Amino acid sequence: LMSMDTEEMLRAQPMDACVLIGGCDKTVPAQVMGGISADVPIIQLVTGPMLTGSFRGERVGACTDCRRFWASYRAEDLNDGDIEEVNNQLVPTVGTCGVMGTASTMAITTEALGLMVPNSACAPAVSADRKRIAEKTGEISVKIANENLKPSKFLNEKSFMNALIVLSAIGGSTNGVVHLTAMAGRL
């Protein structure tokens, strides 16, 4: 649904290029799918991952640790105060989950496709790099608009094979295979 919404908005608006802003699991692939289908110059700007937290000296992060701590709470090994403290540490800053889940996987593979500023997928959401990345994304959006650099001009089977190789190299989410296949199907 989001990919269709993105596609229709891109087709309906008189724009020369579009900066797609997303972050979590399904937003990035949906936006890219819509952009590929609309075949207008696009560049993705992801929000970046959150920082990890700490609970009783242990490094913790959203997604990876929440189920384990919730099970401990249900087993009454943690009390109400403990689980509140854990919750505050599982999501200590803004950003996508700070693990190699689908959000990080799709940011990295979208960068591998050439649809993002190089070295922008993993900069934390709260870092000063995010502003620099956003500025560079804006610069590139003007360039791709002037060159009318549509996805159909540079995305191909080799692009997606490269993204799959990157996916394997990073040990990314298996959801990445599904999303990359769906994105490639829009060419």
Regions found by a protein language model. Name each.
Residues L1-N162:
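Active-site cavity-forming subdomains of large catalytic enzyme subunits
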Residues G35, T110, S168, A184-G185:
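Residue-level preference for well-ordered alpha-helical positions
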Residues L164-V166:
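Flexible, glycine-rich loop/tail regions that form catalytic "lids" or insertion modules at the edges
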Residues V177-L187:
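Alpha-helical support elements that line or immediately flank enzyme active sites
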